[in-house]
Amino acid sequence: MTKRVLISVSDKAGIVEFAQELKKLGWEIISTGGTKVALDNAGVDTIAIDDVTGFPEMMDGRVKTLHPNIHGGLLARRDLDSHLEAVKDNKIELIDLVVVNLYPFKETILKPDVTYADAVENIDIGGPSMLRSAAKNHASVTVVVDPADYAVVLDELAANGETSYETRQRLAAKVFRHTAAYDALIAEYFTAQVGESKPEKLTLTYDLKQPMRYGENPQQDADFYQKALPTDYSIASAKQLNGKELSFNNIRDADAAIRIIRDFKDSPTVVALKHMNPCGIGQADDIETAWDYAYESDPVSIFGGIVVLNREVDAATAEKMHGVFLEIIIAPSYTDEALAILINKKKNLRILALPFNAQEASEVEAEYTGVVGGLLVQNQDVVKESPADWQVVTKRQPTETEATALEFAWKAIKYVKSNGIIVTNDHMTLGVGPGQTNRVASVRLAIDQAKDRLNGAVLASDAFFPFADNVEEIAKAGIKAIIQPGGSVRDQESIEAADKYGLTMVFTGVRHFRH
């Protein structure tokens, strides 16, 4: 019995060669629309879909394959006499291979000028139906959705006259993943169109970006996936100019770094980061000086860290960074001379370029946190704050220099793991106290790191002080200005302690926990 294949593809890469090889193996080819035209033009004989269905393609191609002569030929079980009798009684011919890929919905909605009507018209109906029918009946039918699988199918057909069950099952699984992702993308688009912020079903689709050697630790398996609708300002979209593949921990740290620097758009800034905590932030009138400040913040912790710069890297800055062991450098661009300096004798240094002009668009994405058996979803902590809305709660007002330093500290503290404390001046971090289970321990840690540079320093806390002992520690160290959210039932005790020691303290009214 002659074997039949149905081919209907939007991605025509390799399809002519695939069909030609099938013809050599004696296969009969059914095809539709543009695919049939492409095959006919290449000299591959095909049967029109309407010759199989007895109906013409209609409604601008919306209806062409949704017919019992197609789906009966796909779904009929070869091991059931009743199915084979139904096929015979209704003059349905069996289809043994389906090669289908879908309308380019993703590519359509990514176009800057796409209309809603264009998006709707690129929702494939017949294609997913054929794929699912063939995949359901994979015991007898081979289904191909990815041109990368043409070769393995041809090899097995040439060698054995049919594909193995294992191959058909693997290809069916791929189809169900593909159609699920396709529908998830459509659901995501429509959910956004109607402004639904809390859908009762959440479907997310990501594409494999990079299989990883291991995860956070060597005993953990891991992979890196990218959103099906890519975000330009993202480590997943970064252009790697040098170095080894990014590790699991590299990616998490790099992501934290590019989030931090979004808050420092106005001035040349360098952020150094280790284990998702900033270990140095420097801000200046030029990027070289900003690097100096970030490095001087903590010359020890920066070793083996990640650095992100929000201005082009020039040769002078590259020379300074070249002398420090770094895992990753991220910047919007690099001069040719700077790149040559950084790469010299450092083939493993990972150098990434990112479009910093796409930062704002990245801020609207939701954050997803996995828990056992569930998923937490929240907006990013990108609330717009204005110092004009802050409240000085002490008798003493901040000086102009202190006010500038407090603004800088408040931007920096947002990215320190809770309980988080940071000590800064108006252009660089001096001490970081991250992740302690009580706030006074974080205060002591940050002060101890900054102890030789406390003259004129200020301190920021990511959440309120539950007791006045924090203020006591700060005053004892000689720090004269504090910024914190406020909101404790004991705020007045902290205010009184600040007044007692002549400190100025600002309440922002906004908490910045980070777990």
Curated annotation (Swiss-Prot):
One GO process term, biological-process aspect: 'de novo' IMP biosynthetic process
Keyword list, A-Z: Hydrolase, Multifunctional enzyme, Purine biosynthesis, Transferase
Enzyme Commission identifier(s): 2.1.2.3, 3.5.4.10
Gene Ontology terms, MF aspect: IMP cyclohydrolase activity; phosphoribosylaminoimidazolecarboxamide formyltransferase activity
UniProt xrefs under SMART domains: AICARFT_IMPCHas, MGS
Gene3D superfamilies: 3.40.140.20, Methylglyoxal synthase-like domain (3.40.50.1380)
One cellular-component annotation, GO: cytosol
Pathway the protein contributes to: Purine metabolism; IMP biosynthesis via de novo pathway; 5-formamido-1-(5-phospho-D-ribosyl)imidazole-4-carboxamide from 5-amino-1-(5-phospho-D-ribosyl)imidazole-4-carboxamide (10-formyl THF route): step 1/1; Purine metabolism; IMP biosynthesis via de novo pathway; IMP from 5-formamido-1-(5-phospho-D-ribosyl)imidazole-4-carboxamide: step 1/1
Pfam families xref list: AICARFT_IMPCHas, MGS
Chemical reaction(s) catalysed: (6R)-10-formyltetrahydrofolate + 5-amino-1-(5-phospho-beta-D-ribosyl)imidazole-4-carboxamide = 5-formamido-1-(5-phospho-D-ribosyl)imidazole-4-carboxamide + (6S)-5,6,7,8-tetrahydrofolate; IMP + H2O = 5-formamido-1-(5-phospho-D-ribosyl)imidazole-4-carboxamide
CDD domains, A to Z: IMPCH
UniProt key word Transferase: yes
Annotated S-S bridges: none
InterPro entries for the chain: AICAR_Tfase_dup_dom_sf, Cytidine_deaminase-like, MGS-like_dom, MGS-like_dom_sf, PurH-like
Residue intervals of the MGS-like domain: 1-145
Family: Belongs to the PurH family.
Database matches in NCBIfam families: PRK00881.1, purH
Record remark: domains: The IMP cyclohydrolase activity resides in the N-terminal region.
HAMAP family: PurH (MF_00139)
Protein name: Bifunctional purine biosynthesis protein PurH
Organism: Streptococcus pneumoniae (strain 70585)
